A protein has these predicted regions:
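N-terminal loops that bind phosphate or other acidic moieties
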Residues: 2-145
Length: 145
């Protein structure tokens, strides 16, 4: 079967955060093919999370050669499920902590190139640092660079 994309993206989070991020991303850049979400709800146990993560991964793998999973928190259930899945596969990379600036840059780069995951992630720290600003009424501000 011919792969249509190099990198599938899976957003995973506690609650609806991942769906909100996807909706906002689509407002900015348009349709995001090969991007799925897994929301963890209070009624789910660890096995439920693992099953949903694996099902989303398998859907992405039908079209994509690699899968990039973004999770909201390092020690959260979505991250634990993603890391467990990653440990059993060779084609998964997990990134913990994501925001809209990161998603816009990476999805745009993914959509306009044939990069592999490691190439796509080069410079992600700079994007993250430059997207953080602390501003005051007095005009003082901090940026991560």
């Amino acid at each position: 079967m011919m792969m249509e994309c190099n990198i599938g993206i899976l957003l995973a989070s506690h609650g609806e955060y991942c769906h909100g991020a996807k909706n906002s991303l689509e407002m900015i850049i348009g349709d995001c093919p090969d991007l799925l979400c897994v929301s963890v709800t209070p009624s789910m146990n660890n096995e439920d999370v693992q099953v949903h993560m694996r099902e989303a991964y398998e859907l992405l793998k039908k079209e994509c050669s690699e899968v990039l999973i973004f999770t909201d928190l390092l020690c959260g259930s979505p991250n634990h499920a993603a890391v467990r899945l990653m440990m059993s596969r060779e084609d998964i990379t997990v990134v913990t902590g994501y925001n809209l600036a990161i998603l816009v840059e990476l999805v745009n780069r993914r959509n306009t190139s044939d990069l592999k995951v490691q190439e796509l992630l080069n410079g992600i720290e700079d994007t993250l640092a430059s997207s953080l600003r602390i501003m005051t009424k007095e005009g003082e501000w901090y940026h991560g660079n």
